[in-house]
Amino acid sequence: MKLLFVAGILLTWTCCSSPPMQPLEPAFFCWETTLHVSAEERSLQDSLGCKKLYVKILDIGRNAGSGEIEPYSRTDMSDSSGLKGLRIIPTVFTTNEVFQNISEEKIAWLAGKIAAVATEHGSFEELLFDCDWTPSTRDAFFSFLKQMRKKVPPVARISATIRLHQYKFPQKTGVPPVDRGMLMFYNTGDVDEESERNTVFHPDDALKYLEGAPKNYPIPLDLALPLFSWGLIFREGELWKIVPGPLPLEDMRSNGKWIENPLTDPFTAQLWELKDGTFLGGHYLRPGDHLRVSAISPALLFKAASLAQKLDLADDATLAFFHLNIAGSAHFSAQLLDSVCKTVRN
């Protein structure tokens, strides 16, 4: 009788317990205008077991003079030496302005142009669109996505990036008519505000988007985490330039031209004040300019991964790191990134 009772408990526990979640599939974004995967970058991917690479193929915006829709840049993909065995996911960035005051005819035209570029390099399993749509452009952007569905092969998925504010307020912002979403779990601060703690990612800011968010997002979600840094240059209190990282911090510490302010907490962006004129990122900075450096450390990346446990990710979700740049990823080994993937699924 006791054995039957114990067996009943075990059977009940087995029936009620959730099946283990699938491991996240690791991937990277490649956001350069010339596609080149170095030997070091490929080694990082191989060591991580990464078989997928999201490659930006187009930047699309409006001409400042004519207002016409045109590509800002088109990625040179002639160098395929480091791509063998990788599944390439073409990715298209469009500014929000593209979908302002646009006709259905123009939407269909744009979809056709993009489909033609995307198919130039062979078949693909997915086509990702990156656009921070707003209530005023939502209908046009969603119409565009439906047009893209008609233009690409039926076997290919259509996906779209999801910002944190869109994740938290799907009823207000709408849910894109796509097969999957890529949730961008970064850019949590306002780059125009010099007082922001860390515009790339700060746990307190990210948590605000998670509190009160729906438990179930209407479409399957993949996840993107940051591996990048940037410097925001402020002149007379206003944002002047954004300089992509990594920045030459050691040189800045030793050349005597900068005042380095101490960090207020380990996750806060670092503030630098310029004493003497100098160049940075191809820009001439004047005395009195301020530089706020927002970066991701291993500790901050693990903090993001822990918070990401609260997200409604797909069972077969991908974790894509933004972006593949060995200079900017020097502190992130394959072993560390694998631990990050496992932390999200913990």
Report each predicted region and the residues it spans.
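Glycan-binding loop/region signatures in secreted carbohydrate-active enzymes
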Residues: 234-304
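Structural recognition of alpha->loop->beta junctions
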Residues: 49, 118-127, 171-190, 246-261, ...
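C-terminal motif of bacterial Sec signal peptides marking the signal peptidase cleavage site
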Residues: 12-15
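Catalytic domains of carbohydrate-active enzymes, especially glycoside hydrolases
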Residues: 36-62, 117-124, 310
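Acidic/aromatic/glycine-rich contiguous surface patches that form carbohydrate-binding/processing clefts
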Residues: 319-346
